Structure formats: C-alpha cells, structure tokens
Amino acid sequence: MAKPTIANVAELAGVSQATVSRALRGATNVTEETRIKVQRAADQLNFTLSKSASALASGKTMRVILLVSGKLNEWFNSGVLQGVYEELAPVGYDVTPAFITDRSELDRFFSQLPKSRNADAIIISSFQLMPAMRDQLQAIDLPTVGVNVPTESGYFDASISIDNFSAMTMAVRLLRSLGHTNIAFCSDYIPADMVYNTSQRTQAFADAAQANATDGITFSLLTADAHDAPLSKSDLASQLTAKLLSLPERPTAVCVETDQVAIALVKELRKQQLNVPEDISVLGFDDAEIAQAADLSTIRQEPIELGRIAGRKVLQLLRNEPLEHPHELQDPLLVLRNTTSRIDSGAAPAE
C-alpha cells in the first residue's frame, strides 16, 4: 500500500494542500472546524506531517538543546532530561542532549553553534556561561533557560534553580542544633575557567556559615587538590578524608557537595576507624536513589521537576508569552537518615 501524502489528506478533507499544512502545524489562520476536519482525514489515512517539512514551512527546527555538564546517565542530568522531555515532546519538540566535561569542549560547542543554528532554544544545566558565549546566543537570537545556574548573572532569559543558600542554611542550623561546633564542607576541585553549580554550593555554605557564626563555632572549607582528569569518587573521598584528619581539630560534622561523594566519604572515614555518625556526622546533597540505599542524611532537590519547569519556560519564550517569574528558586528539603546524630548520642531518627 502506497504511503499517504499530503495531497491524499487534502482530497479527503476537501481543502487545499496548503491548508492541510497550516492545520497540522497548528497555524493560527485556520478555523477550528477546518483543523478538526483535516486532523480526522490525516488520522484516517495514518498521515503525519514530517518535521522537516513543518520546519521548512514555519522557520522552526522544532528542536531544543539540553546542554549539561558531566555524563548524561548521571542521576541529576537524566532527571532534568526526563522533566524537559515530558513538557516539550507532547507539543512536537525534539530534545537533543549534549554534554561537556571541560572548558575545551564547551568552547568547541559554542564555536559550532552559530554555524549550525539547529535549535529553537537551549537549556543549560548546572554551569555558568561566559560573557562571549552569551553574546553568541544573543547574536543568533536563541532563547536560553538555565537550570541550577546563578540567576544574578543576567546571562539567561529565564531560570529555575535549587536555593543553595537556603539549603546550606538548613544544613548549618541542623548540625548546630545537634551540638556540633566544628563543621566542614567538602567539595571537588573546580577549574578557575569553569563555574559549576557545586561551586555555588560551596559559596552558599560559606555565606550560611558567616550568617550563623557565633563564638565557639568553627567552619572549614575543604577542596580537593587541582587535577586535570576527573577523580574517581573513592579517590576524591580519600583525599578529602586526609584533609579532614590533618586539620588541627577534626570536625565533628561534614557537609558534602553531592550524595555520591558523601557516600564514598562515609566509607573512607570508616576505613580510618571513625564511626559515622557517632564520631562524625555526614550530610549529603541531592537525595538521589543511592542516598536512601546508603541511609544517608541529605538535602533533597527534584531534578525532574526542575526540568519540567525549564521546559515550560522554554515554551513560553518560544511563544513570546510574558513570564511572570522568569527566575525561580526551588525550595530544598532536609532528609534525616542515619549519618547524622547529636554529638553526644546515637544516630538521628530516620525520615
């Protein structure tokens, strides 16, 4: 059986081929009655307007790029992708994921973008743009939405981010309420030419520590040594543990930039004959699936919901609809399990 064509749909619906094209693309200059008639004819013939034809007629690619740092199969990145897809796919947009791991890959991506212009919008997750990159996006009129990015930069048309300062304030107040007076924050090394969301988290901890500082409270920021290739989580935890134990006075509580690093840190601390949480409390960040399995106390963020909100903002920008709140913050949630406790007692109760 021959594949149905737009001419077949036009004949069955009793309209022109141009009207079929406009109706199936959702153009506004088609009556609802005609649109329904055309759609019924298309359904009867199992006809679908090709995206390439639709793009040629509308001037749109019907494609949105999701640019993330790190690997696509990581918990946070896959969650954001799922949320973006849920919002964009039902209205006909393809979501094209791309990932970068260092500055050279980021520069290469942006050097190729103006030449291809193969997307209608771009969502950038968990890292900051450089001024030259933002200029490139503006030059090709590409709407830009950020996920977990600094909202004060002005480099994004819209954004949705976890409230890092609120999260770190919760963490500091929790640990202080449990009697801890020597609290550290542990993070991986971040190159000076990149600004990731985790670096915002480090600054948020420093700000929260300053805001909650009182006599007798000590805060420490511990960062891995500079390295070119990414460290494994176990190697990173080993290095951070060595830094913790080399302090003049060992902290009794540690906040960690991600759950994965926190879990590796707990394992390394126990190898050093330190009991968690009796000797040292550990608090992660993310509440990924692995955190529940490891019974890790942590701070929850919702990457799927972040992706959904980013997807909705993209659609509003593409439709030229006003955004009531272009830049939003997602509230974090403390999840207490069994890696935090009072300094003088057993483990904190599970959630």
Where are these regions (language model features)?
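Short beta-strand elements in bilobed, periplasmic/extracellular small-molecule ligand-binding domains
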Residues: 88-100, 202, 206-234
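An alpha-beta-alpha
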Residues: 169-212, 326-341
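Short acidic capping loops at alpha-helix termini that bridge into adjacent secondary structure
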Residues: 181-182, 216-218, 276-282
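N-terminal helix-turn-helix DNA-binding module of bacterial transcription factors
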Residues: 1-61, 350-351
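Hydrophobic alpha-helical segments within soluble ligand-binding/sensing domains
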Residues: 160-186, 203, 207, 233-243, ...
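Flexible loop/turn connectors
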Residues: 238, 242-351
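Alpha-helical recognition/docking segments in bacterial nutrient-uptake
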Residues: 1-5, 62-173, 246-249
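Short beta-strand segments enriched in small/hydrophobic residues
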Residues: 19, 56-72, 182-191
